[in-house]
């Protein structure tokens, strides 16, 4: 793969790959309904650019295609991860954040979906590192591994199907504005219960629950949705975990609140304790506690650490990003970029 990587990297760079963006068009107000707020530009990688790991090989993105008869396409029988790479300009180095932990979590998802792909976690880490390295990225990057039921059948089953892994990467900066503050709403769509849908696994089919919530939120002018459990307590954002600071105490919904066991969430719990001497409570949080919070922030691979400035059109205190949130964000990003020796074991350097 080493020789292939060099050749493909040269070809890719000579092509002068560019990042494409797409924007949803605003829909004017009709029949008394509010207009859909214009969505932020979301980075999209052209399928003619770059390379991917697909069916056991490194291939051009344009060749990484599945049949319309693929089981995962019909029934959502796939699981995925999102891994960020952070560029350090001073060190001229790109760092993969918690790569092994992401694949270990994917392995947990495999168990839920009765998957047995041929690649081991060690092999997937090596493939990911090589795939990112061969592109020669000198900016922040997002890596998307996905494992899916690749058999071509309409049968409702899991155990008897073939499994395949694919990985691709593309440049991506901030998914949302992490400094401005998010306007969020509590969604009418409840978070899927763990007894009905395995929310601790990142199963693709389960994300229709999130899509419904965030689409309704953005259609009515909000940036994000907060989802409640079937008991009415706070669960998480559409695709991110949530923290509440009140009276100097930091709290986050417990794992039993139908949340994804977030890797960023775990990092922030560690940082809050080690850098700020705080005790983090993992517990049930009532909806009204959001209205009484001193600070709220969301976290995840996509949103990173993003302050929330209003909930259901009620300002969070001053309606501006909280001081603690922004300090925690700064410490987090410093660790992600390999600037803090104490947390160097969290990151994997891409370039030798």
Name each region found by the language model.
Residues 4-119, 123-130, 153-352:
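Helix-start/capping segments and mature chain N-termini
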Residues 135-137:
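Non-catalytic accessory segments adjacent to catalytic cores
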Residues 140-147:
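ATP-grasp fold ATP-binding core
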Residues 150:
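Active-site loop/lid in soluble adenylation, ligation, and acyl-transfer enzymes
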């Amino acid at each position: 793969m080493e020789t292939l990587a060099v050749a493909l990297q040269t070809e890719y760079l000579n092509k002068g790959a560019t990042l494409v963006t797409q924007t949803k068009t605003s829909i004017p107000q009709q029949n008394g309904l509010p207009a859909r707020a214009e969505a932020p530009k979301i980075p999209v990688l052209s399928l003619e650019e770059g390379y991917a790991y697909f069916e056991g090989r490194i291939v051009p993105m344009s060749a990484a295609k599945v049949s319309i008869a693929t089981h995962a396409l019909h029934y959502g029988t796939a699981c995925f991860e999102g891994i960020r790479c952070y560029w350090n300009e001073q060190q001229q180095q790109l760092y993969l954040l918690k790569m092994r932990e992401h694949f270990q979590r994917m392995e947990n998802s495999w168990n839920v979906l009765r998957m047995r792909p041929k690649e081991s976690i060690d092999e997937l880490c090596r493939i990911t590192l090589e795939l990112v390295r061969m592109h020669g990225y000198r900016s922040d990057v997002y890596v998307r591994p996905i494992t899916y039921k690749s058999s071509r059948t309409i049968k409702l089953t899991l155990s008897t199907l073939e499994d395949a892994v694919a990985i691709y990467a593309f440049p991506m900066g901030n998914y949302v504005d992490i400094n401005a503050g998010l306007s969020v709403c509590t969604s009418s769509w409840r978070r899927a219960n763990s007894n009905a849908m395995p929310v601790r696994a990142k199963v693709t089919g389960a994300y229709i629950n999130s899509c419904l919530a965030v689409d309704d939120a953005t259609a009515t002018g909000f940036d994000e949705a907060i989802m409640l459990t079937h008991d009415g307590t706070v669960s998480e954002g559409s695709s991110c975990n949530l923290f509440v600071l009140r009276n100097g105490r930091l709290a986050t919904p417990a794992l039993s609140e139908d949340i994804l066991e977030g890797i960023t969430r775990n990092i922030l719990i560690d940082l809050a304790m080690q850098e700020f001497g705080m005790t983090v409570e993992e517990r049930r949080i009532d909806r009204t506690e959001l209205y009484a919070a001193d600070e709220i922030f969301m976290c995840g691979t996509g949103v990173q650490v993003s302050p929330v400035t209003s909930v259901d059109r009620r300002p969070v205190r001053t309606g501006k990003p909280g001081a603690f949130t922004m300090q925690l964000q700064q410490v987090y990003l410093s660790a992600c970029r390999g600037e803090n020796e104490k947390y160097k074991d969290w990151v994997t350097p891409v370039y030798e």
